Amino acid sequence: MAGTVTVPSASVPSTPLLKDELDIVIPTIRNLDFLEMWRPFFQPYHLIIVQDGDPTKTIRVPEGFDYELYNRNDINRILGPKASCISFKDSACRCFGYMVSKKKYVFTIDDDCFVAKDPSGKDINALEQHIKNLLSPSTPFFFNTLYDPYREGADFVRGYPFSLREGAKTAVSHGLWLNIPDYDAPTQMVKPRERNSRYVDAVMTVPKGTLFPMCGMNLAFDRDLIGPAMYFGLMGDGQPIGRYDDMWAGWCMKVICDHLSLGVKTGLPYIWHSKASNPFVNLKKEYKGIFWQEDIIPFFQNATIPKECDTVQKCYLSLAEQVREKLGKIDPYFVKLADAMVTWIEAWDELNPSTAAVENGKAK
């Protein structure tokens, strides 16, 4: 007699990937009602909420989520004088959450980012895709024309060196956005009604030696591999620049990943970016950066890190010194930023003493 095969119901939830190894970091100034939409995907995970702005304001978090919430008073209490390296009145404050996390992986998302749908109409579990990206290797040393060769249905194309097919460890997964594009203020002004409706089903590795503008609103990374480099700089209140926090972190991170032979992926997953920020306010924040970036980009393109720098911390301190020496000639702000970069590493090592001497990759 044939046995009966029981097929599990589709409604039975699968075990969340890395449930005990990943923190979700959210910077905010408002109630987190947007979490209701993300509940099916986020509820099993621990949240770190970094409250920006007025610390006396109460932030409402929907019931049922496991979270810690830190405001400016908490940041000052925990870091003391070193709290000066954490931005105020700017989403760059999120990096405090990276510092206090004790998990191997971090996913960060903005509070105006909703669940997107794929072309079939299915809700996209952005976190699951980020985890897939981080757990599979990257290909920074040779470009594969089928993009990610480790995805189901893909492979290395003819002519791809067999010696490089093992790939490199993936440090960062950079996701994209439907609806409101991540444009700078001048582009926002000339294209106020533009919306991104193109869903490109692809994940690719950013090649070694290539920089890119990292966006922090849909981003995941391996904290053990690259965490100390994910400093979002000095932005916002009291600073001459804003809206360059995630890009600054991305440029520093990419130079260090290249040095340590680590990989960075971009593409899937998509989120739905619901709200356009004010382009006139953005222009005031970005104004100096629009000019400065013409010097900042060549600086990072030409930056070299000594081979003896075999940890992220050593690499980052080397970059900080170069920022002080070279970009400091452009504006005194960069001397202040370089000091903050050093303070950030000191604070990171105080809160994470076991990671201070860990080799993160292989220096090239």
Curated annotation (Swiss-Prot):
Site positions per UniProt: Required for activity: 158, 165
Keywords assigned by UniProt, alphabetized: Cell wall biogenesis/degradation, Glycoprotein, Golgi apparatus, Isomerase
Impact upon substituting residue 165 to A/K: Decreases activity 20-fold
Any one GO molecular-function label of the UniProt entry: UDP-arabinopyranose mutase activity
Glycosylation sites: 158
Cofactor(s) it depends on: Mn(2+); Mg(2+)
Motif (DXD motif): 110-112
Signal peptide annotation: none
GO CC field: cytosol; Golgi apparatus
Effect on the protein of changing residue 158 to A: Loss of activity
Catalytic activity from the UniProt record: UDP-beta-L-arabinofuranose = UDP-beta-L-arabinopyranose
Top EC class for this record: isomerase
Protein location: Golgi apparatus
PTM info: Reversibly glycosylated in vitro at Arg-158 by UDP-glucose. Reversibly glycosylated by UDP-xylose and UDP-galactose.
InterPro entries: Nucleotide-diphossugar_trans, RGP, RGP_fam
EC numbers, comma separated: 5.4.99.30
Gene Ontology biological process terms in this record: cell wall organization; plant-type cell wall organization or biogenesis; UDP-L-arabinose metabolic process
Activity sensitivity to pH: Optimum pH is 5.5-6.0.
PANTHER family hit by this protein: UDP-ARABINOPYRANOSE MUTASE 1 (PTHR31682:SF46), UDP-ARABINOSE MUTASE (PTHR31682)
Family membership noted in the UniProt record: Belongs to the RGP family.
Domain notes: The conserved DXD motif is involved in enzyme activity.
Oligomer status and interactors: Heteromers with UAM2 and UAM3.
Annotated function: UDP-L-arabinose mutase involved in the biosynthesis of cell wall non-cellulosic polysaccharides. Catalyzes the interconvertion of UDP-L-arabinopyranose (UDP-Arap) and UDP-L-arabinofuranose (UDP-Araf). Preferentially catalyzes the formation of UDP-Arap from UDP-Araf. At thermodynamic equilibrium in vitro the ratio of the pyranose form over the furanose form is 90:10. Is probably active as heteromer in vivo.
The protein's name in its UniProt record: UDP-arabinopyranose mutase 1
Lineage: Eukaryota, Viridiplantae, Streptophyta, Embryophyta, Tracheophyta
